């Protein structure tokens, strides 16, 4: 991705976030975060008390009360700032996307064909089903499907990649995105969405997160935080009569300070920022998530369905050998294989034509001049070929050719079965060539497993994630490649129906499944999967079925998506642990300061030897506010992620964030107390 990455504290974003933090001080905005709403009420209450003390309407230390009140307002502002900064980063990314949208006109065709009469209309008036013509230099005005033509398209405004891509009618490369530019030739496009519903519009809406809903885990954590807040609120409320009965009633200002320091304000103030930042980090990986729920689900995934081609292997299978059947010479097999591949534009098909040319000097022949009919490959038939004169030549998977022969009254030879097994055991893909009902032999297609992929799968296994390779190869080939790559399981001879059934099977076992896809035939499985990453180069149906879109169209990105999801969950859990552990030090700071006058025995808890009750309480409140600011970078960037088992991860986080949450406040509160004392502020 070539887009400029935002600095963590971009000056313009910080200024805007500070303004938004002040705007969020209104009760309606605060009510959405129950923990910080309690702090907001406490700030308001102590402000009123400070004013009353200053005017003489109430007895007490007005300066101390004002200091507490001021730092409580700062606490609320810092929490608002964290959320506003995260939202500001997302909106800045959205603004870069808005720059792609241009007010333009489109040539709307009156008939769905090239050369038809056209009307010039504003692009924002195009409706679903309208037909438009775009030529070299034009901006594509809407999302749609190419129904005629082929062109080179610059998609860098959307994907960040400068290399142009080919878009043409038919197949999985017919989908185009509004806002991209035609570099050469022309396309006739059928609009697939109405105004405001384009992929670019949805990207902007998703990134801005204006309607961001809380995820299930976020809701569960919020409920826990509310429960803790209620417990501490009730406990604090009982302390006033408790101290009054002892003969020295503690002030309301001190009780509010105690309450604010005990409730989990750290995670309460950063919770929204963590959620927004998770989606922002996903965008940083060039993946657009439809919601925070999708990002969170990625963190809970325990089954990955990975396409073999392009994900596990390099994806450039090449014909490496012609293996003739008994009684057939190799040149006859090569000639038939080349004829069956003349109109096959896949890399495999072109490699078969080239291999026949190299081995036997068989030159390419024009399908039209031969008066031949090309039979295209389909996911259901699993074979392709050519009909020429009285010859019917097909090439395809072993099972598909076997069914084809038996349907034509033929018999699949035993020696070819042996040759197929031999090719498959070597990790190559066997394609069988047949003419009529006579098997001519086998073509070996060789692919290479990506370097380092086995180690990545070992890491995923250590994390408790099962990897399943999806391939159209036969079981022997699939087993050989699966063993070489180190995946846990595989689905061979996969059809769209088989993928859908496999996903449902895992989900019935209580597992969360993630997969990638780019074709229309992937849409049912993408719609069923818990995390479905559609390729931006794929069809409109695939992108609509998925809950994420990878702008780089890189199937391997699924592993990174899972890492980002887990990092978001870890960040939330780690900061929750840190926030709750913080309370221990605050007990030792505020409890002796507030109640030692009534119960001198509580002085034993003043292990930090803080200067005075006022400095102890003020130091705890100041630390409580400042820690939010210090943790903002961690909330936005996420905690350091390492692929470990769940138990090892728990131990690591308890040591770092649990123990850290215990020790840091002791040090921080003591340092603040010393500074207040040295400066003569208490």
From Swiss-Prot:
Top enzyme category: translocase
UniProt EC number: 7.2.2.6
Regions that span the bilayer: 34-54, 62-82, 219-239, 254-274, 588-608, 616-636, 656-676
Cross-referenced CDD domains: P-type_ATPase_K (cd02078)
Reaction equations catalysed: K(+)(out) + ATP + H2O = K(+)(in) + ADP + phosphate + H(+)
Assigned protein family: Belongs to the cation transport ATPase (P-type) (TC 3.A.3) family. Type IA subfamily.
Protein name, per record: Potassium-transporting ATPase ATP-binding subunit
Record organism: Escherichia coli (strain 55989 / EAEC)
């Amino acid at each position: 991705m070539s887009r400029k990455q935002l600095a963590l504290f971009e000056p313009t974003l910080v200024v805007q976030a500070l303004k938004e933090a002040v705007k969020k001080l209104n009760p309606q905005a605060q009510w959405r975060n129950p923990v910080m709403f309690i702090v907001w009420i406490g700030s308001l209450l102590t402000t009123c008390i400070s004013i009353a003390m200053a005017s003489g309407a109430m007895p007490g230390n007005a300066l101390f009360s004002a200091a507490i009140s001021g730092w409580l307002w700062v606490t609320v502002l810092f929490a608002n700032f964290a959320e506003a900064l995260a939202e500001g980063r997302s909106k800045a990314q959205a603004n870069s996307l808005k720059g792609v949208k241009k007010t333009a006109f489109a040539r709307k065709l009156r008939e769905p064909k090239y050369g038809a009469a056209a009307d010039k209309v504003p692009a924002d008036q195009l409706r679903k089903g309208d037909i438009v013509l775009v030529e070299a230099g034009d901006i594509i005005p809407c999302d749609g499907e190419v129904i005629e033509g082929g062109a080179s398209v610059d998609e860098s405004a959307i994907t960040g990649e400068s290399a142009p891509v080919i878009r043409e009618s038919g197949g999985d490369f017919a989908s185009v995105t509004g806002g991209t530019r035609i570099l050469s030739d022309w396309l006739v496009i059928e609009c697939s969405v109405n105004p405001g519903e384009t992929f670019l519009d949805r990207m902007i809406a998703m990134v801005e997160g204006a309607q961001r809903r809380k995820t299930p885990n976020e809701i569960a954590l919020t409920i826990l935080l509310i429960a803790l807040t209620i417990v501490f609120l009730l406990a604090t409320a009982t302390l006033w009569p408790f101290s009054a009965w002892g003969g020295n009633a503690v002030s309301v200002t001190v009780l509010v300070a105690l309450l604010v320091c005990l409730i989990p304000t750290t995670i309460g103030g950063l919770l929204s920022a963590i959620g927004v930042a998770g989606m922002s980090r996903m965008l940083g990986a060039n993946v657009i998530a439809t919601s925070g729920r999708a990002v969170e689900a990625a963190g809970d995934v325990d089954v990955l369905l990975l396409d073999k081609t392009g994900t596990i292997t390099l994806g450039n299978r090449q014909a490496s050998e012609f293996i003739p059947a008994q009684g057939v010479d190799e040149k006859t097999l090569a000639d038939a294989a080349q004829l069956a591949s003349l109109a096959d534009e896949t890399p495999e098909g072109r490699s078969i034509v080239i291999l026949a040319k190299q081995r036997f000097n068989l030159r390419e022949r024009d399908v039209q001049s031969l008066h031949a009919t090309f039979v295209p490959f389909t996911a259901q038939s699993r074979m392709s070929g050519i009909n020429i004169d009285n010859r019917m030549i097909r090439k395809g998977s072993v099972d598909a050719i076997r069914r084809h022969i038996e349907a034509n009254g033929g018999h699949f030879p035993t020696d070819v079965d042996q040759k197929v097994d031999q090719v498959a055991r070597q990790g190559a893909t066997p394609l069988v060539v047949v003419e009529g009902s006579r098997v001519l032999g086998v073509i070996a297609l060789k692919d290479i497993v990506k370097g380092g992929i086995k180690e990545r799968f070992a890491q995923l296994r250590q994390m408790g994630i099962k990897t399943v390779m999806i391939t159209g190869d036969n079981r022997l080939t699939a087993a050989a490649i699966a063993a070489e790559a180190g995946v846990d399981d595989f689905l061979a001879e996969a059809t769209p129906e088989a993928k859908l059934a496999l996903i449902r099977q895992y989900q019935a076992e209580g597992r969360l499944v993630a997969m990638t896809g780019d074709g229309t035939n992937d849409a049912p499985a993408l719609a069923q999967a818990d995390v479905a990453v559609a390729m931006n180069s794929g069809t409109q149906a695939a992108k609509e079925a998925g809950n994420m879109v990878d702008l780089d169209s890189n199937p391997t990105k699924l592993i990174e998506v899972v890492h980002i999801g887990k990092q978001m969950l870890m960040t939330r859990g780690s900061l929750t642990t840190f926030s709750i552990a913080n309370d221990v030090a605050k007990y030792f700071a505020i409890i002796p300061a507030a109640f030692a006058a009534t119960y001198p025995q509580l002085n034993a808890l003043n292990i930090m030897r803080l200067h005075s009750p006022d400095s102890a309480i003020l130091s705890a409140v100041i630390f409580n506010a400042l820690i939010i600011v210090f943790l903002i970078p961690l909330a936005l960037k996420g905690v350091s992620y390492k692929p470990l088992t769940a138990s090892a991860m728990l131990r690591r986080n308890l040591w770092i964030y649990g123990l850290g949450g215990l020790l840091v406040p002791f040090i921080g509160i003591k340092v603040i107390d010393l500074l207040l004392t040295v400066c003569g502020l208490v």
